[in-house]
């Protein structure tokens, strides 16, 4: 009986270690995982459109990062703060698009804008993350500037 319990416990440990919910193995080795997505920060500086195109060329379904929750924002901010100076901007996938005389924000991956962290909106059309009052917030800036950027894609199953 004791041997059966020992073997059963051993199999349970092996099963749990192989089925980790946040396993990075589904993301390429140089990408980070969070939930169902893979992320990578690129420090080379590009214009917004060039950065978006670069992301789409990295992986199927990849785009500039969309941020859909406070939890995801914290993850993205942590990645950036570990690799980018506080004063540097980082492109995200949000843009303002004119649709039928109405300005509307949209993520480049077409996901809905359900979470916002915008500071001081103005007439510029592209968005960056910038240090503001102790954390990174969204600012809209001129799309032709060159900044670092982060890409994101849905992890393969």
Curated annotation (Swiss-Prot):
Pfam family, one: Lectin_C
Domain of life per record: Eukaryota
Tissue expr: Expressed by the venom gland.
Keywords: Disulfide bond, Hemostasis impairing toxin, Platelet aggregation activating toxin, Secreted, Signal, Toxin
Taxonomic lineage of the native organism: Eukaryota, Metazoa, Chordata, Craniata, Vertebrata
Subunit structure: Heterodimer of subunits alpha and beta; disulfide-linked.
Main subcellular location: secreted
GO MF: toxin activity
Protein name as catalogued: Snaclec mamushigin subunit alpha
Localization terms from the record: Secreted
Free-text function comment from the UniProt entry: Binds to platelet GPIbalpha (GP1BA) and enhances platelet aggregation at low-shear stress. At high-shear stress, blocks platelet aggregation in a dose-dependent manner.
Organism of this sequence: Gloydius blomhoffii (Mamushi)
GO CC terms in record: extracellular region
Signal peptide feature range: 1-21
């Amino acid at each position: 009986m004791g041997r059966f319990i020992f073997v059963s416990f051993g199999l349970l440990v092996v099963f749990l270690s192989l089925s980790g919910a946040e396993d990075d193995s589904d993301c390429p080795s140089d990408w980070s995982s969070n939930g169902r997505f893979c992320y990578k920060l690129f420090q080379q500086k590009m214009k917004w459109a060039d950065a978006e195109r670069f992301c789409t060329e990295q992986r199927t379904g990849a785009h500039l990062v969309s941020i859909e929750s406070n939890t995801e924002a914290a993850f993205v901010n942590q990645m950036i703060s570990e690799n980018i100076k506080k004063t540097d901007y980082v492109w995200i996938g949000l843009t303002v698009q004119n649709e039928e005389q109405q300005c509307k924000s949209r993520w480049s991956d077409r996901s809905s804008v359900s979470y916002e962290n915008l500071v001081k909106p103005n007439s510029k059309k592209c968005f960056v993350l910038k240090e503001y009052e102790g954390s990174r917030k969204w600012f809209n800036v001129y799309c032709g500037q060159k900044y670092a950027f982060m890409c994101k894609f849905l992890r393969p199953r």
